[in-house]
Amino acid sequence: MAVQISETVRPFANFSPNPSLWGDQFINHKSKTQQISRIYLEEIEGLKNEVKCMLTSTPEGKMADTVNLIDTLERLGVSYHFEKEIEEKMKHLFNLIKADNYKDHEGCDLYTDALHFRLFRQHGYPISSGIFNKWMDGNGKFKESIKSDAKGLLSLYEACCLRTHGDTLLDEALVFATASLKSMAANLASPLRKQVEHALFQHLHFGIPRVEARHFITFYEEEEHKNEMLLRFAKLDFNALQALHKEELSEISKWWKDLDLISKLPYARDRVVESYFWAVGVYYQPKYSRARIMLTKTIAMTAILDDTYDSYGTLEELDVLTKAIERWDIKEINGLPEYIKGFYKQVLKLYQQLEEELAKEGRSYAVYYAIEACKELARSYAVEAKWFKKGYLPGFEEYLINSLVTSTAGYLNIISFFGVESVTKEDFEWFSKKPRIAVATQIITRVIDDIATYEVEKEKGQSATGIDCYMKEHGVSKEKAMQRFYEMSTNAWKDINEEGLSWPSSFSRDIFVQLRNFSRMVDVTYGKNEDGYSKPEKILKPLIIALFVDQIKL
């Protein structure tokens, strides 16, 4: 029997609708993939071969030229075509500098030192931050001579984000480079001024690769010594990949419209386009097309589940819903409140479809791990709902244990592994045990989200926010609590950076890149003290337009 409540009092009776910004814009997209293929495919392939020749034929003694080329390819967003060649080059170059004990760097300028440091660490090579010692004076301060080196300081600024827990010099370097760049930015000439201003707004290492590529193509076009062939290749490739993304977004948008869940659940956020943007942030390459579709559908459905627990369901209704999710059986639908029956049915249907899809390649076992994570998520959502309803303020540790689960990072990262064929059953087992890098992604998601949503949650009357729990337990101000949350995020990023240098490892490089990209999505979506997912107008809308609406002019 369905739950009957004579006089229902909703948690937020004055909830406001959360309509989509996009309407049917992407449903009505007419694919231009075939047209682009006919006109540009041959040229793209030809340019790709030219770039490959450039990459493989760089002289042995010109390390700086090789590293600059690799960095340019990565920042233009085309390096995915040359992963094998780039890794071979990076491995060879790192072995050279290690054998030479970094002596080759003694004559390098700051820009080159910092670029090499960043590139090697990005690729998992443990280059020492000691290469920056030569830029310090006898008092342990950075030399005055580099304070006017804008290009070098920008390179140092970006390199600092790859620091680990032992890199105290880079903690100081980040403060120094940030202050120096801020003081000189307005007086720089473009395109360097634009690059500095963008970097101060969004760190490269914490940015979304596809978004950063779109920005860099614009910057590179203004460079005096640009390579015209590389620029055209990047533009053509961006437009071709954009066409594929539009096709996927059209397919997903049609699926979402056919479900018609939002009309029945007006309290829920209609964010399927933003969910797809998130999936592209995790992996944008053509080979992950199916993975993006799987992840997008799950993110959009998870937002509805979150809103049901957070903004609409009563404790009695949520108790029934939690038990139904725990039992994971369509028969449970009969006991659910009427408004949520359709949603519950579609969740089970989605998982059945995912299982059938994965069964084709003998990987249906993956669904078990996602279902278990979904059950854990529902239980933790229920705990938060009880805290709010009863006005209970938990201790910070109690809050954090539960809220790391409700960050959804663990659950959604499991889903993100579905479409990656290299991920094995052993990888799912490893991840389910909450290894260090998994916890780091959860911490980043939790604390950055908590900072961004604090004021909105307080307006709703929410007392058990992470900030409030920390303030009460430690007797500090809101500002001090937020500062501590930023420190937790910084330390979690250092954990991720350290895990990226631990090769060979118990998990694959593909998994590492996905987890790092997931954390980057958090920084972009919530890192400017705004909830970009719930209120996408300011943060996500312009990025979505840049990636999925506007082509690059050739």
From Swiss-Prot:
GO terms for biological process: diterpenoid biosynthetic process; farnesyl diphosphate metabolic process; sesquiterpene biosynthetic process. The keyword Cell cycle does not apply. Pathway: Secondary metabolite biosynthesis; terpenoid biosynthesis. Binds 3 Mg(2+) ions per subunit. It catalyses: (2E,6E)-farnesyl diphosphate = (+)-(R)-germacrene A + diphosphate. The keyword Nucleotide-binding does not apply. GO terms for cellular component: cytosol. One of its GO terms (molecular function) is magnesium ion binding. Its EC number is 4.2.3.23. Mg(2+) 1 binds at D306, D310. InterPro entries: Isoprenoid_synthase_dom_sf (IPR008949), Terpene_cyclase-like_1_C (IPR034741), Terpene_cyclase_plant_C1 (IPR044814), Terpene_synth_N (IPR001906), Terpene_synth_N_sf (IPR036965), Terpene_synthase-like (IPR050148), Terpene_synthase_metal-bd (IPR005630), Terpenoid_cyclase/PrenylTrfase (IPR008930). Pfam families: Terpene_synth (PF01397), Terpene_synth_C (PF03936). Mg(2+) 2 binds at D306, D310. CDD domains: Terpene_cyclase_plant_C1. A motif (DDXXD motif) lies at residues 306-310. Transmembrane segments: none annotated. Its cofactor is Mg(2+). SUPFAM superfamilies: Terpenoid cyclases/Protein prenyltransferases, Terpenoid synthases. The Asp-Asp-Xaa-Xaa-Asp/Glu (DDXXD/E) motif is important for the catalytic activity, presumably through binding to Mg(2+). Belongs to the terpene synthase family. Sesquiterpene synthase involved in germacrene A biosynthesis. Also produces additional sesquiterpene products, including 4,5-di-epi-aristolochene, eremophilene, alpha-selinene. This is Germacrene A synthase. It comes from Pogostemon cablin (Patchouli).
